[in-house]
Amino acid sequence: MALSKAEILDAIAGMSVLELSELIKEMEEKFGVSAAAAAVAVAAPAAGGAGAAAAEEQTEFTVVLLEAGANKVSVIKAVRELTGLGLKEAKDLVDGAPKPVKEALPKADAEAAKKKLEEAGAKVEVK
């Protein structure tokens, strides 16, 4: 017997964050997709509207990878941890620097992401 959409949503609502993370990884592997790529694509238009509000006080920040530095493998690992991207997507992002890693973040989260990437050896900017 197939589960209804409501039953699936109820099951997901009862999961912990760790269980949800594992479920997403399994779904990405099974269906050959990346949930993070869709989230970045959805967040990009929202960040465009933030330019008008920047004249006031900036509340959303973008972490931009300027350069991978000498330890590219560590930077790729850090990008994967921060974004949830797959290995190929994270490598492409690092190879294509300068590129935004995360967008529309609160200042504290942006600074934490910057610190993590810098510890891995990358040159990073918060805009």
From Swiss-Prot:
Family matches, as SUPFAM superfamilies: ClpS-like, Ribosomal protein L7/12, oligomerisation (N-terminal) domain
InterPro entries, sorted: Ribosomal_bL12 (IPR000206), Ribosomal_bL12_C (IPR013823), Ribosomal_bL12_C/ClpS-like (IPR014719), Ribosomal_bL12_oligo (IPR008932), Ribosomal_bL12_oligo_N_sf (IPR036235)
Gene3D superfamilies: 3.30.1390.10, Single helix bin
Highest taxon listed in the record's lineage: Bacteria
Keywords of the record: Ribonucleoprotein, Ribosomal protein
UniProt-listed CDD domains: Ribosomal_L7_L12 (cd00387)
BP GO terms, sorted: translation
Record keyword Acetylation present: no
Listed GO MF terms: mRNA binding; structural constituent of ribosome
Ribosomal protein recorded as keyword: yes
PANTHER family documented for this protein: 39S RIBOSOMAL PROTEIN L12, LARGE RIBOSOMAL SUBUNIT PROTEIN BL12M
Subunit-structure text: Homodimer. Part of the ribosomal stalk of the 50S ribosomal subunit. Forms a multimeric L10(L12)X complex, where L10 forms an elongated spine to which 2 to 4 L12 dimers bind in a sequential fashion. Binds GTP-bound translation factors.
Chain's role: Forms part of the ribosomal stalk which helps the ribosome interact with GTP-bound translation factors. Is thus essential for accurate translation.
Name assigned to this protein: Large ribosomal subunit protein bL12
Organism: Bordetella pertussis (strain Tohama I / ATCC BAA-589 / NCTC 13251)
